[in-house]
Amino acid sequence: MGSLIIRGKRVVAGTHRVSGNKNAALPMIAAALLTSEPVTLTNVPDIADVALMLEVAKSFGVKVSRDAKTDRVTLTAAKVRTARIPSDLAAKIRTSFLFAGPLLARLGRVSLPPPGGDQIGHRRLDTHFAGFRALGAKAALGRKTLAFRGTLKGTKILLDEASVTATENILMASVLASGRTEIYNAACEPHIVDLANLLNAMGATVDGAGTNLITVEGAEELHGCTARVGCDYIEAGSYITAAAVTGGELTLTNVEPEPFAVLEGAFARFGVSWTIEKAKRKSEKAKGEEVEDDAEAWELHYVPKKKLKMKYDLGDAIPSIADGTWPAFPSDLLSILIVLATQTRGTCLFFEKMFESRLYFVDHLKQMGAKIVQCDPHRVVVTGPCALVGGTVTSPDIRAGIALVIAALCAKGETKILNAESIDRGYVSVEDSFGALGANIERKAS
């Protein structure tokens, strides 16, 4: 188990290129199984979860060509040799379950063990099952395997929750189903839009992605294409927070403006704001490749304020930040915002509605000197500013891990973060990225 050693009180400032969105890349990798032709994805992040997802794809016989330097991945599923995911791979990454929809659509069957991933709370799969059944698949649910089989037909499906992965799985299953499928109460996240754009580029007919009603006209077959993974606005929010708590000026490249409209209100509560502008630049076209001229043409600029101050509600009521399904504030940024609150003058209530175990990491922040009261598994009250002090902490999951990194960057002294591999699942080489921005951070093998 590796660790990160961070010596705090250094300004994080400069220019950082935001990676592609992990939550878009993973289902897009799974979608490549829907055709026998090559599918090329660009702007794919070089992170551990992507590597694991590609290993799962290879287990089906998919040929994978990856160029990490250009963030390009090409997948060719000419022949799918099995409909079963190896249990050892499924235990490592929860999104292995996203292969269920494509396999069911292409082969008419799928068998996989219960998925793994971060232990941030109970995440039900019932919505996936109900969607597959509605499309005509018959289920055989055992203790160690989840199996579905059948010929899929379009229908109307009302999801009992706006689950992102359920929406993705049912969407991928329905593109090769006969007839029309209507998915009500669909998730609206930007990565759903990225997936739909890929499917349409492959020859599918998907309308309404980004709204709570998605319609699909089933196709007989899909073909290969090239598609781009959208920007990781969660990574962007993490780096903005790191700059804010250390007093640095930051420019983020390779961003897209749409997701930040959802984030800006919550960040403004803490006195953090930014501007996004077009930065047209010349594209370098590699031989035989098509490059979108505007692919990286937006930049985000953050200029720090002298002091961070909480913006209270009318009547000086304590503000509350709650997560929810898009376009509510994303759960993946709540841990990061809690660290921002420790460095902001004022008090704020955080309400984690989606995962009952996500907020337990605040014990590590309290160990570092944060003034936090945990009301229950879903709510904490943070009062700032706090003078954080380094120590030894353990990263329990991706988002809590990066939150601890940010806390260490503004803490006095040295902080050792154990289980650094959990952070690698969602962030590209944080020691190099933050190091390039002025942080004193190094990785050590434990």
Regions found by a protein language model. Give the residues of each.
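Short, structured segments at the rim of ligand-binding sites
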Residues: 1-446
